[in-house]
Amino acid sequence: MQEKYHPQEIERQARQSWQETNIFNVTEIPDRPKYYCLSMFPYPSGKLHMGHVRNYTIGDVLSRYRRMQGYNVMQPMGWDAFGLPAENAAIQKGVPPAKWTYDNIAYMRSQLQSLGFAIDWQRELATCDPQYYRWNQWLFLRMLEKGIAYQKTQVVNWDPVDQTVLANEQVIDGCGWRTGAVVEKREIPGYYLAITRYADELLADLEKLPGWPERVKTMQANWIGKSFGVDITFPPDTASGMPQALKVFTTRADTLMGVTYVAVAAEHPVALHAAHNQPDLVAFIESCRQGATMEAELAVQEKKGMATGLYVLHPLTGERLPVWVANYVLMSYGEGAVMAVPAHDERDFDFARQHSLPIKPVIRPENGELSVPLVQAFTEYGVTFNSDRFSDLTSPEAIDAIAVELGQKALGEKRVRYRLRDWGISRQRYWGCPIPLIHCDSCGVVPVADDQLPVVLPEDLVPDGSGNPLAKTPSFYECTCPRCGRQARRETDTMDTFVDSSWYFIRYACPDQSAAMTDQRANYWLPVDQYIGGIEHAILHLLYSRFWSKVMRDLGLVSFDEPFANLLTQGMVLNEIFFRKTSSGRIQYFNPAEVDVQHDGEGKRVGAVLQADNQPVESGGIGTMSKSKNNGIDPQEIIEQYGADTARLFMMFASPPTQTLEWSDAGVEGAFRFLKRLWRQVYLHRQLDGEAAATTTLVPHQEYPADLRDLRCQLHQTIVKVTDDLERRHTFNTAIAAIMELMNELSDVQGTHPAARQLMQEALENIVLLLSPIVPHICHVLWRELRPGTELLDQPWPQADDQALIQDEVEIVVQINGKLRGQIRIAREADRAAVERTALQDEHIQKSIAYRPVKRVIVVPGKLINIVV
């Protein structure tokens, strides 16, 4: 065994051994428990970042741990390979997106392999592979047959930078999720998936997911947004020119008698009708199209509106109510119209005050009066007043009574509604899965036949950055109609890339199946036992995947209800941000590796300078590693300098996996020093013992010297703790800390006493086993030194020795007059008299007693002694 730890050499040796034996390739074994561990697959952007390293190391630790427990473990890997970044890179570099993507995949695969992940590479897939996306197309056609997929024209979210439609879930704070551009509203035809058909099941089945974070389940429940209310029809005041009745949905029918106006969305047909001869209203409607698109954003933006001059009638009183166009009304929720009750809704209150509209209170607190005039809306349930025949009812009673009368007048009925909207999947871009439809002037929309799938993208196309590239490529869109044989045109929209990631985890189970989308192997491996990824995917990917799985279940393709049994959402990786403001006002960011932090004589930080010019830079504090802030750390540099095991160890030790991790160069150095110390400890042990031998019971536990018995007890306590940390809590940092504490104690074991050598062998073997899921390369090599002729990956997870856990001595708490004054250690089997004698003879206890007479002594065996003075 060499004396020095050379990580690159031993890591290459370990990986070569794993590759030669295909040790991580798995098949179905019915009589063994399976464990499917999956980290969300990456977009092949070109290089791994530290977030990837953290994500995949978490999954690898759990996979290796379960493998040692006897599970049949599958940990696959693939590439979420479609998407706009490839198109944009192709535009900049003048190369086809396919080449850019596959080149990136090759490099990132080599990076993943250099990190030593226990991946079954025979299952690798890329979503841009026609043999993968043919099944997107096949399932889309099945959805079309079932009415789950359909076409409609609707006002959509339009990203002006990427020039494509975005789903509601892809609009964040009014901006595109990828570009950050302010989203516009446009009326465009497209294809939709009826996820709303599954809204009730998607909501109810959250109860089947105890292994998911409550925060994620709450986010999904709120997004689905089930609400109980009443559909109410406001008849038109035809004398005002109102062309139609207005239907609204409200959860607060108890406030109906307080309605003072009705507001409609800018895209509502009534708004468009009213705008015909009102240029100001036309301009206002256009400005609304550039505004916010989500409820949360609308709630906080300035409330703007214009009167239409049209009126509707109150359904119960017949009162004329003005119709306004308001920027806080969403066309996508309910009917695109709201009944406005300023006294009892904050948005309506703000709007009414701004436009001098009446405010009529009709609900007061159950135990008190309402202070009038209102200074803010009273939005709670209460008791009705000023409501004619519906006065003096509780809010629930009033809702029921008003719903009954509306029903009798055929002007309303109780309804359940959802915030969730059907999923628009049409994208006006090239690098995505083609929608398998043909447009024929004679036959209409015709599905591509199953035996003609996949509709393949032209992979040599280089986009020019304007419009939809496929719509400008005759070789792609020109075709003949499969029904009538006349000239026709292929659909040139492609599918939202979230379609690709909505079922990839199922395809991993049967990637070589060419005759079907899936087979029975999926029902062996699924659901995923442990899924790992960022909380930013709580609504988008995770909700879509749950929906897709349920559709596949209903089509008989899989047998499970939920795809992910347990979910771990890892925290972000953070690093310091350094920048300068240029003379033009632009902010220029510098990588922390290019900056020297300065300290004074007492070690206090006083500033930072750029290495290139020795001039000051400002600190922007700690933030998520990102390209835009130039504060990322290249994993490859860490691997080349310290080795993959050091990177893995730091990532697992620096923070619990669900919390943010702050990058620390000193922390990386510390991880490297620990691995060098582990290597040296095994080296010294091997030098002392000559040829290492397997642990044998040369010295029974009870014959160990007392100090070695205590150390062996600590060893087996560490096994218990590390097992619990990995099994139940996933707190890898505390598991590593316990192993480090044990290592510190081992350094005191000296000499050639058989018990000492035996304990050192046992301890080092178990430390290597416990650490092997976290730092597998070094452990692979050290195991061969400790147990020649055996392989670490053939070993089971360590089991604690119950006999070793029995301590010879126990710690007894000592109280004086009921107050804690110290502890004593005493033989476990000591009788009451011995406990009392030891406590009274303790130097610190004697000082606390201060020669006061002892009245009595209370002993609780094995726990405490209370001396009454």
Curated annotation (Swiss-Prot):
Motif, 'KMSKS' region: chain positions: 624-628
Catalytic activity entry: tRNA(Leu) + L-leucine + ATP = L-leucyl-tRNA(Leu) + AMP + diphosphate
Extent of motif 'HIGH' region: 42-52
Binding-site positions, ATP: 627
Annotated InterPro entries: aa-tRNA-synth_I_CS, aa-tRNA-synth_Ia, Leu-tRNA-ligase, Leu_tRNA-synth_edit, M/V/L/I-tRNA-synth_anticd-bd, Methionyl/Leucyl_tRNA_Synth, Rossmann-like_a/b/a_fold, tRNAsynth_Ia_anticodon-bd
Membrane-spanning residues: none
EC number, UniProt record: 6.1.1.4
Subcellular location: Cytoplasm
Keyword Aminoacyl-tRNA synthetase: yes
GO cellular component: cytosol
PROSITE patterns in UniProt: AA_TRNA_LIGASE_I
CDD domains with a match to the protein in the record: Anticodon_Ia_Leu_BEm, LeuRS_core
UniProt GO BP: leucyl-tRNA aminoacylation
SUPFAM superfamilies reported in the protein's UniProt record: Anticodon-binding domain of a subclass of class I aminoacyl-tRNA synthetases, Nucleotidylyl transferase, ValRS/IleRS/LeuRS editing domain
Keywords: Aminoacyl-tRNA synthetase, ATP-binding, Cytoplasm, Ligase, Nucleotide-binding, Protein biosynthesis
Enzyme class: ligase
GO molecular function: aminoacyl-tRNA deacylase activity; ATP binding; leucine-tRNA ligase activity
Family (UniProt): Belongs to the class-I aminoacyl-tRNA synthetase family.
Descriptive protein name: Leucine--tRNA ligase
